[in-house]
Amino acid sequence: MGEPFETPGTPDPNLHIYIDADACPVKPEVFRVAARHRLKVTLVAGAWMRVPSDPNIALVVVEQGFDAADDWIASHVERDDIVVTADIPLASRCLERGARAIGTTGRPFTEDNIGDAMATRTLLADLRGAGEQTRGPAPFDPRDRSRFLQALENAVQASLRGDRSR
């Protein structure tokens, strides 16, 4: 029944993965990669959810409120930590703190592309506000899951090496 989430050994105390957990479709993939590298994972959500019984995995339930989970993550993330989120403003805040951010479809957010992502988000919000109908995100598919796994593994390897290029 799948891979175990626990891996013997001590987690790397300098690297942490945070998940913007509400509606995140790739939590099991994060658990697998984190177990392989013995990394701590913190899921941040607005409501309780089931998480694996693993001493390296924690759930933080924040008060209901606009951006409460985002604010918690942004205030706790540190340089080279990894944040998994589909929220572009949260990704931007984390990049400002020196962390890495990966979208749930495997798109790494970087200093080079976050400005365009924010501008596109703002433009689409403005169009919707003006009554225009815009397409929502494409349905999540197995290729997204595969891209995400590769992007997360790349981010973990880069953080463990101390690679500052983003």
Predicted regions span which residues?
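Nuclease catalytic cores that cleave nucleic-acid phosphodiester bonds
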Residues: 2-166
